[in-house]
Amino acid sequence: MTWRDAAIDHAKLMAPNESCGLLIDVAGDTVYCACRNLADDTDHFIIHPGDWAKAEDEADIIAIVHSHPDQSPDPSAMDRQFCERSQLPWHIVNPADGSWGKCIPLIGRQWVWAISDCWTLVRDWYALHGLLLPDWD
């Protein structure tokens, strides 16, 4: 089972609440660690500190994963802000249709033409501040 399959299964189990988890690097393999969500409402997540510590003890944490059970997996403004704070990539899944979104911190990105290039950096910086710019055609 891939980490994406594990994250989707966890998201389906937790719906209608958001699921949350961590990706860790175990000897070069990416592994999904399901975490408990401490948020009081269905539209947010707070990773249980004990789950974070356990994952951190097992291996390096390389990303955060959570679900948007009833909406697009595109990162919200809050997702973008907390992605920056965490300095980790965020993967977002909609368990209903299996679609994925991603948010990458502005600092430390690997440059990839048309995926994570200069325009993407500028566009994502503006999105972090509430101004959505279109992708170039």
PLM feature spans:
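Conserved beta-strand-loop surface patch within small alpha/beta domains used
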Residues: 1-63, 70-102
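N-terminal capping segments
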Residues: 95-137
